[in-house]
Amino acid sequence: MGKKGGTLKRSSKSTKTRKDIVEDQYDDEIDAFHKQRDIVPLDVNDDTDESDEDDVQPVFDLQGVDDESEEDEDTEDEEEAENGLTAKMIRQKKYLRAKFGDGDDEMADDDKDKEEDKRSTWGGRSGLYHSGDNVDFDILSSDDEDIKAEEEEVIRLRAEQLGSITAADAGLDDDSEEDSDRELTMEEISDKGKQATKSITDKKEKGDKDTHVEEIKKDINSLSKEEQMDVVYSSAPEIVGLLSELNDAVEELESKINPVMNKLKEGEISLNGLARYLEVKQLLLLTYCQSITFYLLLKSEGQPIRDHPVLARLVEIKSLLDKIKELDEELPPGFEESLARSIANGAVQKVVKEDQLTSPVSDSVDRITQDTAKPMKIDNAREEKKKKGEKRKHQNDLVDVQSEEMLKLRAALEGKLRTNGVLGSTVSKSDKAQKRQKLANRKLETFDDYVDDADNSTHNVTADKLTKLVSTKRKPKTISGDDDLPQRDDIGERRRKFELRVLAGAGVKSSEGDGRNKNGAFASDDEDDNDGDNNDMVDNDGESEDEFYKQVKQKQQAKRAAKAEIYSRKPHLMPSSPEHVDGKRHISNQMVSNRGLTRQRNRDLKNPRKKYRKNYEKKVTRRKGQVRDIRKQTGPYAGEARGINPNTSRSIRM
């Protein structure tokens, strides 16, 4: 049997020739495009290969470019789908959309969100904008409308992005936080209420257009007092209590404490133990009023008071005032009434004193009103005596017995000192007032102040007293000149008198006198000048200079003799010990028994200090042989004092 001849199976793959491969290498992109266009595909339904449209990526997702083509495709699809079940489903979907409309809105919202996401993410790849194929500038110049549309789209997207940025994203929410922390004033609260009502009405109008809402506007000034108080209670309930306490404190200060303190300062009222208490209470009330006013000021300005130290200050002062109120209860029951009476009496006495000071003084008025004023004066004197007695009783109760004894001793000592002339002069004030300093030139004195010189008559005593109170003493007016100078002796004469007084004080008696006056004190220059010829100390008739020098020499000798007596040293010789009949006193038995027991030692060694000194000197001499002394150069080189030893080397070995 012969073999059946078989046929060779050829592969369906088209084998490329060498010529085709070479041509493909030299083909350009344009040549490849034209070759691809000329090829007719055999499998029409084969869409496995990717089309060029899939490679296209939109740069700007512009609306209205391909909308018409898409709508046409949608309508064609719907017409095809109407046949059969799909048509029924589409109709059912349309019916539901028309009836409810919720799903359509939700889908529309989802589509809008997707579109916004697409718009916000345009131009994600920068490579799409470079190395484009559109090299023809004529084509670019023809698309001016597209470029304008792109610019508008960019501007719109940027505006949307900027609009979405809030103040919190930029870090500018500090001001809003500070405004929220700050407490609002009454006007801001009312404005805020108006804005809130407006926003509520706007929301209601947007939500339901059919319903009509009326706006309510509130003005605090137009409200009644009760409504205003309700607003105050709601915003700051503590203000009302603080205002009432402020009014009470101010009233207490003005009506009770300040008048009493003024009287105490003037000295019209004497409160021994209660003055300090009233001062403390006045200070506390003043600080409390100050703190309340500061709190109200902060509240009116709208500043935050939540953590302010004025609150702690108010609480502290309030606690102190409560403690003082407890002390008020411990005061005697009639204390306030007595204070009021004392204030009234002080005011009346002050008015009477002012009337007395301002009343005109004249002899005729005093004589006329003297008889009528006697009973009033007697009554006033009795009242003053009663008051003095009460004050003395009160003082005696407070002062202890020991303090009274000390005061008595002090008064006795002062009296003794006055009598001796140590503390003050014994001359009374009335005598001093009567003595006036007389001028040397009484002729030049002007007597235009004759009213001040009161007469010593007994019938005009009241006028004299009032003139002392009201009028002030005026110095007599004089005319300046050489006549005002006092007449004095020559300087030589005054010097001689002074030396005579010094000699008399030293104890040297002169022939002219003692140099003392009648009272025993040394006379002054003014007394010598005033006495003149009546001076007994000086004899102006027969006095020579030789006698004066003799007196001075005697004075010096007397002074030297007195100094010699004081400072001289007399040799006082101590008497030797008395010797007995048998000679000097004998030593004791112990001394005799101990004699000869101590051995004889070297003088340099038995004293430790001397011993150590000798040892030190030996060490110093031995040290000189080891280390040579440093000798300073005193002059030019004079050779070696001890000779040159060639064996010694003073150099330093390296």
Swiss-Prot record:
Residues 140-160, 243-263 form a coiled coil. Residues 1-16, 552-561 have a biased composition (Basic residues). The keyword Isomerase does not apply. It holds the Pfam family Sas10. A motif (Nuclear localization signal 1) lies at residues 2-9. Essential protein during embryogenesis. Involved both in gene transcription regulation and in processing events critical for proper rRNA biogenesis and nucleolar organization during reproduction; contributes to pre-rRNA processing at the 5' external transcribed spacer. Binds RNA. This is Protein THALLO. It comes from Arabidopsis thaliana (Mouse-ear cress).
